[in-house]
């Protein structure tokens, strides 16, 4: 892993769409205020479902600058990704036309792809699922795009003029972390000079809500949606579904400095592991997540003593929060009790594949502004979750090095380390 030390990769552009407001500034304002943006589902009639709450985005495709064609034919997840890619490129100050297009890469994560569009079209052509599709002429042209998640990274690649490596990463709820990890590797390995990377998911649709209902993973606290997402709280009863996108522009630090670009954070380390255990179950000792944390810190040439903040997966399920707490203790030892830990899912919900990138955006902004977002709705401690979860109120302090972790159904465990880019030690 030390082979990468000579190439330092930094984030020079950020684009965010999340519940609670459009843009990076609105996202950060919501997090630091400790406000929640979860509410009763309005995107469809969720009355028949067990969980009827979500973190929705007030999103107007035309108002966001998409063309009528993009607004009418792109899946919502694709729309979010394209808008965020545009915002990230603008924020970076980079003109893609000034870069060899073969040296621009794209890495976009998604857990459920274009499920919303697919769900909608299936209902339309099958009379709500009451009959099989017998007349293919009823299907819209973009049905194939809804069927394959590669359509998302294709549109982002076209937006960036990217002719280099382009990929979609789909590793469940770690997709957003993994996509950025892969994008970082493209630059470190010399396969790209610029990578537009991140993740998107718009899973608030009947089929996705039904899937999580079936395994009782989501909160049923429908009478109080603003307080339903309660990571690490003793009374948590599952996660609250969300939607969103975060996209970054990555460059080598020296190239960013040559053009006078602002660097939010350096991607120092990344690692991923699998528990090879169960579709939804987690081993209680947190070993695989702990191994990912240790490997990411090793690649970053950091230790637990260097950490100022941990952005937890913190989904709000009974087993995840216990498992994650155990992983922090296993990997960091006594230091785990001293490092502030928080979960932004308490405020914006769990946007599946997109959440890892949204959390990395929060980490980069924590470094930028010297503020740690809180864990909202934290009221009653769980004896098995006994760390400092930054309850309810943001905390101002210098933040130089941050760990962000993710856990996904299927056993995926990922970790990334971001650091203040002006640091010179390798």
From Swiss-Prot:
Reaction(s) catalysed by this chain's protein: 10 malonyl-CoA + 8 H(+) = tetracenomycin F2 + 10 CO2 + 10 CoA + 2 H2O
UniProt KW keywords: Acyltransferase, Antibiotic biosynthesis, Transferase
GO cellular component terms attached to this protein's record: cytosol
Domain Ketosynthase family 3 (KS3): 6-420
Residue ranges of coiled coil: none
A Pfam cross-reference name: ketoacyl-synt
Active-site residue list: 173 (for beta-ketoacyl synthase activity), 313 (for beta-ketoacyl synthase activity), 350 (for beta-ketoacyl synthase activity)
Function: Involved in the biosynthesis of tetracenomycin C (TCM C). Part of a type II polyketide synthase (PKS) that catalyzes the synthesis of tetracenomycin F2 (TCM F2), a precursor of TCM C, from malonyl-CoA. TcmK and TcmL form a heterodimeric alpha-beta complex that catalyzes the condensation reactions between the growing acyl-enzyme chain and the malonyl-CoA extender units.
Record's subunit section: The tetracenomycin polyketide synthase (TCM PKS) is composed of a ketosynthase complex (TcmKL), an acyl carrier protein (TcmM), a cyclase (TcmN) and a probable second cyclase (TcmJ). TcmK and TcmL form a heterodimeric complex.
Protein name in UniProt: Tetracenomycin polyketide synthase ketoacyl synthase alpha subunit
Organism of derivation: Streptomyces glaucescens
């Amino acid at each position: 892993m030390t082979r990468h030390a000579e190439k330092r990769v930094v984030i020079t552009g950020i684009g965010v769409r999340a519940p609670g407001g459009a843009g990076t500034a609105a996202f950060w304002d919501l997090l630091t205020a400790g406000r929640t943006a979860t509410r009763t589902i309005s995107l469809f009639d969720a009355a028949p479902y067990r969980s009827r709450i979500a973190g929705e985005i007030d999103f107007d495709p035309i108002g966001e600058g998409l063309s009528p064609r993009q607004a009418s034919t792109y899946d919502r997840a694709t729309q979010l990704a394209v808008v965020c890619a545009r915002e990230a490129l603008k924020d970076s100050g980079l003109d893609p036309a000034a870069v060899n297009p073969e040296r621009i890469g794209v890495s976009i994560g998604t857990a459920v792809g274009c499920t919303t569009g697919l769900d909608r079209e299936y209902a339309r052509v099958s009379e709500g699922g009451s009959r099989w599709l017998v007349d293919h002429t009823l299907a819209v042209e973009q049905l194939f795009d809804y069927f394959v998640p590669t359509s998302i990274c294709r549109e982002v690649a076209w937006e960036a003029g990217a002719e280099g490596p382009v990929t979609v990463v789909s590793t469940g709820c770690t997709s957003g972390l993994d996509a950025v990890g892969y994008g970082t590797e493209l630059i470190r390995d010399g396969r790209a000079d610029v990578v537009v990377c991140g993740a998107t998911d718009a899973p608030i649709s009947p089929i996705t809500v039904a899937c999580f209902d079936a395994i009782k993973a989501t909160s049923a606290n429908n009478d109080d949606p603003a307080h339903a997402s309660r990571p690490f709280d003793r009374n948590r009863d599952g996660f609250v579904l969300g939607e969103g996108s975060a996209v970054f522009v990555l460059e080598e630090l020296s190239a960013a400095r040559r053009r006078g670009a602002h660097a939010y954070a350096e991607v120092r380390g990344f690692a991923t592991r699998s528990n090879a255990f169960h579709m939804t179950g987690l081993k209680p000792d947190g070993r695989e997540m702990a191994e990912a944390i240790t490997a990411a810190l090793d690649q970053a040439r950091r230790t637990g003593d260097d950490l100022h903040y941990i952005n937890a997966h913190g989904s709000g399920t009974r087993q995840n929060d216990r498992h994650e707490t155990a992983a922090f203790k296993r990997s960091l030892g006594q230091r785990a009790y001293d490092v502030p830990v928080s979960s932004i899912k308490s405020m914006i919900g769990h946007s599946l594949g997109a959440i890892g990138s949204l959390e990395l955006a929060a980490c980069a902004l924590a470094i930028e502004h010297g503020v740690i977002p809180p864990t909202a709705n934290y009221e009653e401690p769980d004896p098995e979750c006994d760390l400092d979860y930054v309850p309810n109120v943001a905390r101002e302090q210098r933040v130089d090095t941050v760990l962000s972790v993710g856990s996904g159904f299927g056993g995926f465990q990922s970790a990334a380390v971001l650091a203040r880019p002006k640091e010179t030690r390798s």
